[in-house]
Amino acid sequence: MRRNAAATAADPFRMTARASPTDPTDDAAYRLFERRFGAVRRARQLEPVLTFAVVALLFVLAAVWTDFLPATVWHGLPRIGEYFGKLLSIQPRRDADPVPVLAWAHLFGGVKQPQSLAYWFYRIDVYLRLLWQTIQMAILSTAIGFSLAVALCFPATRTLMATPPVVFVVRRLLEVMRSIPQVVLAFILVWPYGIGPLAGILAIALHTTGSLGKLFVELNENADMRAVDGIRSVGGSWLAQIRYGVVPQVWPGFLSYGLLRFEINVRSSTIIGFVGAGGIGQELKRVISFNIYEEVSAIVILILLIVVTIDLLSAQLRHRFLGTPS
C-alpha cells in the first residue's frame, strides 16, 4: 500500500491496478453525447444528399419548362455540321436551300460570280469599317468601365472604408450596374442618344463598371492589411493608405481582369448592335432581316476571325506584362 501510494504521489496520472467504480452519471452523460453526436453526423451525411436532390429537381423542372430534353438534343447533334458541310459543298445550290454555298470551281471568281469568295465579300470595305468601329466601342467602354470600377471599388471595400453607409450605397450601385443585361441597357440608352455606337459604348461601360467593381472589391478584401495599418499608424491619409498600401498588391489583378473584360466586351459590342447600338452587329441584323445569307456568312466569318485574334493578343499581353500563362 505504501509503495502504491508513493508511486501515485510521484506520478498522479499513473493508473492503479484497481479500476475505479463506474459513475452512473458519467455513463448517462456519455450516452447523451453519443446520441447527439450521432444525430449531428447523420444530419451532415444527409445534407449533401438533400442538396443534390433539390438541384436535380430544379434541373429537371427547368429542362421540362424550356424543352431542353435529351431526345431533342440528341436528334439535333447530327445537324451541327450540316451548315458548314453545305457551305463548302461542290454541289449546286437549290433555290429552296437557304444555306449559301462556296463551290470549289468558282471559289476565286469575280464579285458577280455566285458561289465565290468575292461574291460573298464584295462589301468587305463596309464590314472592315464596322468591325473597326466595334473594336473601338470595346476599347472605349472597357477604359471607361475600368476607370469607374477602380474609383468605386475602394469605397465599397469593408476593410478600407470605415463608414458602413458608404459601403452599402456603393455596393448596391455596382449591383444595379451589373444586374441589368447589356442589351437592355443599350435598348434604354438608344432612346435618349439615338441609334449608333454611343448608346452601345455607354451600355457596355456601365455593365463593365459593375462587373469589374465586384471583382476588384474581392481583390481589395484579400489584400494584406499590415501595410495599410503601418501607413495609418504614422498619420497617413486614407488616399495614402490606398495608394501605397493596397494598390501595389492588387494592381496586377486589376490589369488581368481588365484585359479579360476587354475580350468579353468585343463580343458584347457585336451583340448589342442588334438593338441599334452600332458596330458590326447592326449590319448583321440588317442582312439577317433581308435573308442575305451570303453576307450573313461573310460577317460571321469576320467576327470569328477578329474575336479569336483579339483573344490571342490579350493572352499574350497578360503573359508579357503580368507573367501569367498565355
Which residues are covered by each model-predicted region?
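Membrane-cytosol interface at the C-terminal ends of specific transmembrane alpha-helices
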Residues: 191, 195-246, 252-261, 312-315
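Alpha-helical membrane-protein architecture signal
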Residues: 120, 124, 128, 132, ...
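Generic hydrophobic transmembrane alpha-helix motif, especially the helices
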Residues: 166, 171-205
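Pore-lining and gate-forming transmembrane alpha-helices of multi-pass membrane transport proteins
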Residues: 133, 137, 273, 282, ...
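N-terminal, non-cleaved signal-anchor transmembrane helix
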Residues: 1-143, 155, 159, 322-326
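Alpha-helical membrane-interface segments at transmembrane helix boundaries
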Residues: 128-136, 170-177, 259, 263, ...
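C-terminal transmembrane helix and the adjacent membrane-cytosol boundary/short C-terminal tail
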Residues: 297-326
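Hydrophobic positions within alpha-helical transmembrane segments of bacterial inner-membrane proteins
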Residues: 138, 142-150, 154, 158, ...
